[in-house]
């Protein structure tokens, strides 16, 4: 046995400290952004106008997506100037932001549960119509589910069957949305497409920013859960559509 083989054998025979391993697992686990930090940064960078600016960014996120550089190419000069001003003021980034980076989608997240009224009049925009998802599942797809940030409202303390139904119904949107915005995924296998959105989705679900009681209240208000905290029949049917996709 040479020196390196000996090192390998000795390493493999070392005792495992489960407490230390668990600490490492928690330290190295994927973490999404902290919504509290996003709010703090908005207030600090925006001063007195941060609330008005946040509303503008929420509208942009819901109607035009998460990529300011691309959206200004097809926008009125006035609108383009406003977007560029917001990008500069709040240091808005796109692509792969760091944990504390501000994106349009992240600005939406802290207030997603309170934005239900927006969906009632944002009916002509690409992301709020939902025609392709409704046509695909044969049900009226819940508009509140039609944004990646919705995962932050899914209550992980629901009964497993109902949690899975809400999760899989939302995955149908994420699946179709991912193929729409990422050309390389359009011919990909279902598992590969799901892998592309699973980490941020799970991070949002496991976030502590909105507690489970409040999440459940939002889901009930949106008609995604019944008053008894069960997934509605529509949500269950949509979930089945996703499960049958190949």
Swiss-Prot record:
GO cellular-component term (any): host cell nucleus
Subunit structure: Homodimer. Homohexamer; ring-shaped, necessary to form the nucleocapsid. Homopentamers; opened pentamers in solution. Binds to viral genomic RNA. Interacts with glycoprotein Gn; this interaction allows packaging of nucleocapsids into virions.
Domain commentary: The N-terminus is involved in homooligomerization.
Compartment annotation: Virion; Host cytoplasm; Host nucleus; Host endoplasmic reticulum-Golgi intermediate compartment
InterPro entries: Capsid_Phlebovir/Tenuivir, Nucleocapsid_Phlebovirus
Keywords per UniProt: Capsid protein, Helical capsid protein, Host cytoplasm, Host Golgi apparatus, Host nucleus, Ribonucleoprotein, RNA-binding, Viral nucleoprotein, Virion
Binding site for RNA: 30, 33, 67, 105-106, 186, 196
Annotated organism of origin: Sandfly fever sicilian virus (SFS)
Sequence similarity: Belongs to the phlebovirus nucleocapsid protein family.
Name this polypeptide is given: Nucleoprotein
An annotated Gene Ontology molecular function: RNA binding
Functional note: Encapsidates the genomic RNA, protecting it from nucleases. Displays high affinity for single-stranded nucleic acid. The encapsidated genomic RNA is termed the nucleocapsid (NC) or ribonucleoprotein. The ribonucleoprotein has a non-helical structure. Serves as template for viral transcription and replication. After replication, the nucleocapsid is recruited to the host Golgi apparatus by glycoprotein Gn for packaging into virus particles.
Chief subcellular location: virion
């Amino acid at each position: 046995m040479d020196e390196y083989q000996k090192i390998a054998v000795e390493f493999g025979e070392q005792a495992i400290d489960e407490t230390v391993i668990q600490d490492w697992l928690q330290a190295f686990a994927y973490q999404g952004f902290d919504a509290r930090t996003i709010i703090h940064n908005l207030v600090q960078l925006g001063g007195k106008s941060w609330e008005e600016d946040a509303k503008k960014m929420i509208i942009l996120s819901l109607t035009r997506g998460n990529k300011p550089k691309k959206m200004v190419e097809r926008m009125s000069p006035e609108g383009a100037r406003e977007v560029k001003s917001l990008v500069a003021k709040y240091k808005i980034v796109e692509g792969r932001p760091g944990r504390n980076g501000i994106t349009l989608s992240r600005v939406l997240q802290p207030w997603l549960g309170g934005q239900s009224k927006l969906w009632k009049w944002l009916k002509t925009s690409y992301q709020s119509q939902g025609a392709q998802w409704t046509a695909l599942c044969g049900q009226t797809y819940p508009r509140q589910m039609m944004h990646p940030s919705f995962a932050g409202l899914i209550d992980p303390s629901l009964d497993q069957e109902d949690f899975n139904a809400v999760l899989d119904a939302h995955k149908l949107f994420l699946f179709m949305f991912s193929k729409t915005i990422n050309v390389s995924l359009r011919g990909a296998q279902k598992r590969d497409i799901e892998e592309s959105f699973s980490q941020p989705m799970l991070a949002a679900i496991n976030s502590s920013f909105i507690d489970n009681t409040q999440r459940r209240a939002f889901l009930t208000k949106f008609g995604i859960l019944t008053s008894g905290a069960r997934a509605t029949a529509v949500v269950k049917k949509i979930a089945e559509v996703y499960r049958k996709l190949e």
